[in-house]
């Protein structure tokens, strides 16, 4: 299975600052800051705050539209192979265009002009703005494999199956795992059960598929 790593808001902010200072020191003042949806939008907002210039727009590759301006700065959260950034550049019609990213896989074919940090090996990065979405998906995958899991089994499997250390998870996102479980419960995706003083979770998707009574 893929390996996952969570990053905190403070770490993301430090990457944004690093990228922003590179741009300022380079003397580049873009007319337009193009955020690649959806992760690039959050990074672009912070970077723009430091730059103090540039109109902010979002570019969705699933719904492509040409962007025209004199100078552009393209912002993404993560560059893996570089195909996303390369495809985005085809839609930007500007005299001057520079690229930036918070993180980049070391062996990426695309090297941005401004970069926060490298990833040595491929890892699925759980950014703060995707935390609930990504963790929900992983939890539901685990509950699909077993009828029910208690809190400790769930945390153990997040580590053994996806590399998410429970302690690091709590340090970087205090209380957020409990929030994700609560959200899934409120959405009707999972069921919380208390037995002998312990809390267990069941997937309601699995129960529905099996035709069991949900109560």
Residue spans of the language-model regions?
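PRPP-associated nucleotide enzymes
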Residues: 1-215
